[in-house]
């Protein structure tokens, strides 16, 4: 995987419109809140101008003619409607913070809001109540025209969108994930199935007890994909993990609805918000 070393900003006042027209077929989608956590990590305040310079620098590095800022605004209303405990663990953790930690987090979010205001003068910012950036990115990947798309996020969930035309850059690892540098032992097509079987502890999504990465990949290889596996349940076997799997058809179907960004992004964003996105982006 290629490493990116230079994340310096462009000179002050340089506008995105001045970039070469020859690069206009490259789309860059920025996971806005995710990218801002670099400043929280270093305890940096008043980072709005630095944030803008960082986005401009990334756009220059990837010769992006189109840049779109995708931003969370609360947890997904769609996911909570089908699974009320979605991300409940994060809420519980927040409630145990000290007063000092809460004040620091609130200060960070104030700075982040200011950064969004600054960056909005240069690029379209897509942000809607109860909609997550993952779903906005999935919709853009499916509906925008581009020669190649770069996703700027350290969130591995975005790897569900990787294809010949879509790649990801992580500012945390400073590495690129592409179809040619696919880092997982499963195939790209079975990455969703792997996630469904294992769950996602960060989002409070449970997997099948006793099924780790190796068993999950073996199952997906044997039955082609997660949908085919669900269709044939129950499968023969006396092992405990097989019994758990056979009892988990409903769980796996729920996990698909929670994790399949490509299939359910329209549901997660909502008709009115999609209409607004189309108007803003003229697509």
Regions of interest found by a model, annotated:
Residues 1, 281-282:
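Disordered, low-complexity tails and leader-like regions
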Residues 2-115:
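Domain-level signal for Mg2+-assisted phosphodiester chemistry and nucleotide/NA-binding surfaces
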Residues 2-13, 91-271:
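Extended two-metal-dependent nuclease catalytic cores across DNA- and RNA-processing enzymes
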